[in-house]
């Protein structure tokens, strides 16, 4: 291990990132702009946008099983609530 590697922040795994944002992330409004359906017709992945401080962000997320059961809530054009990290606003999740 090099000297600099000791001080680098360890990458956060996806499950930890989602749990942290779900618990402590700030809320904002967003809009679904695209959705991908699975073989059963349930929406499994969404692309969404949200605006913070005049900056438009775009992101995508695979939906959880419970979110997939509410596919109608994630159709393109629907308004959604997202949670984001105020220190890194591009880091967000669909609630």
Regions found by a protein language model. Name each.
Residues 1-95:
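Oxidizing extracytosolic/periplasmic lumen-facing domains
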